[in-house]
Amino acid sequence: MALPEFSMRQLLEAGVHFGHQSHRWNPKMAEYIFGARNNIHIIDLAQTVPLLHRALQAVSDTVAKGGRVLFVGTKRQAQDGVAEAAKRSAQYFVNSRWLGGTLTNWKTISGSIKRLRHLDEVLNSGDANAYTKKERLTLQRERDKLDRSLGGIKDMGGLPDLIFVIDTNKEDIAIQEAQRLNIPVAAIVDTNCDPKGITYLVPGNDDAGRAITLYCDLIARAVIDGISRAQGDSGFDIGASVAPVREELPAAAAPTATAFQGLAGPRGTADDLKKLTGVSGAIEKKFNDLGIFHFWQLAELDRDTAHKIGEEVGLPSRADGWVAQAKAMTAEAE
């Protein structure tokens, strides 16, 4: 893998150069403004290109060192792109309302995450039948409310090592919390925003859907590059062992029927699946019980199958991330 490439043409086509109306500008952004056209400020992409590359490098370096990246974008245009990019790169996100203290009061937030996990267990188990229909509805509403705010960080396990922000004006509380904890901030900064305190500033349009999609895609790919580098730095050589011939398990050895029937996985020298984010020895054994012994097996899974496997091993929210990591590692081997 390598750091994602992009061109100025891509930025132009996505509308990254369009700022806000000239009367809405923040004078602190003057050095990043090329000029004005029809009372709209035009961002200087000659500066955006190297600054965006710098931000991508910072993201990749953070992940390569084992760090976590938190995507933050709660405005309507950013919600879907932020969530998709974070899931695709096995990272974390906040795309609904930012709860004050999400970073600075992590202990309290952790308590709410535990409550969310408990509600998930209750509502997805036979214990739910012990409640009346009205009680189940109340629990479901509480669970949905918590999931909107915390679903993207419930597996984070601690503070992030870097946050990526769309719209610094709207996410000012998140940025203040990160600054207070000395957490680096990479952010898209429009002409109406204050660049002060942003570690990795990227001048650009923070409203256009195409621009936001481009930013999120590039950051996600930078994360995957970091994951790939981390695997290489750990001395793990994906190409060191040749993938064995795939064999079907004898019928007698087939695993007991469950919600997911398991794969007819090959045997031979197994990959160390514990290199995947959040996979312990116990989870690795569950993978093996389902017939999964190699990264290429995960890389070839479709989304539905991956989620079924995630449910079987008890970490459904990790499924997309595992597939992304596995694809990165198999691509490195090729």
UniProtKB/Swiss-Prot annotation:
PROSITE patterns: RIBOSOMAL_S2_1, RIBOSOMAL_S2_2. Pfam families: Ribosomal_S2 (PF00318). One of its GO terms (biological process) is translation. Keywords: Ribonucleoprotein, Ribosomal protein. GO terms for molecular function: structural constituent of ribosome. GO terms for cellular component: cytosolic small ribosomal subunit. HAMAP family: Ribosomal_uS2_B. Belongs to the universal ribosomal protein uS2 family. This is Small ribosomal subunit protein uS2.
